[in-house]
Amino acid sequence: YFLLALVCLGLQSCLFQEEDYFDDSSANRATADVKRCSELLEAAPNGWVMEYYVGKDYSLGGITLLCKFDDQRVTMASQIAGADETVSSLYSVKSEQATMLSFDTYNYLVHYFGQPQGSMADDPNGTLGGDYEFVISDATADRIELKGKKYGNRIVMKAFSADQTWKQYLTRIKKVEDDAFFYEYDLRMDGLYTGQMLRSNYTFIVTYYDEVGKVHQKTVPFMFTT
């Protein structure tokens, strides 16, 4: 009986022993990560280039946003606006189930894509599928990876180089876009027609034939860069 009692006590101690794998509480870790991400956002001297993809499953493609963060205020520019136009609004970094970046007050350069359009016949309250709240997946001094909270698109921000101005950068992107004025392309292999590629917004709709002549179609998102 004595040995049995010892075994039972040993089992009980194993069953109820919890090991703390972290040096700090989850609340303190979350607070520290919010502080770390906030400092990284503000530390980029010339701001960030955001590769902003729009639409469910990237269905409208990507545009360039430029962002400069400073003490809860963000200044933004975009390839879809004038090259010298900037818009400022409020942002926050907070902890929910993960560390989040949220553009809190209205900034048409980003919120336009997430607001009801009213002109969609099938859904007057439908949006273009753009997020303005993001889970911060990874963050370093040079690169921050985000995931849209609602639509789930992967968004990458890269620290903007200090050797050019925002206006110069956006002007170059606009020139690349203006020079790419063709919207329809034939696909050929060894001189034989194999399909067609149509540009729609910032995507290519690719229609092609396989080796048995069956038609396939897929949408490929893209964005203009310099």
Q: Where are these predicted regions, by residue range?
A:
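Short, flexible beta-strand-to-coil junctions
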Residues: E51-S59, Q79-A81, A139, K147-N153, ...
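Sec-dependent signal peptide recognition
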Residues: Y1-L4
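Short, solvent-exposed coil/turn segments at beta-strand boundaries
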Residues: A43, L66-T75, Q97, I136-I144, ...
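Acidic/polar, low-complexity intrinsically disordered N-terminal segments immediately downstream
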Residues: L15-M100, Y108, A139, A162-Y183
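C-terminal motif of bacterial Sec signal peptides marking the signal peptidase cleavage site
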Residues: G10-S13
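Hydrophobic, ordered structural segments
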Residues: L128-M157
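Preference for solvent-exposed, low-hydrophobicity sequence contexts
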Residues: R154, K158-T226
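Contiguous, well-ordered beta-strand patches that form the walls/edges
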Residues: A77-D131, V206-T226
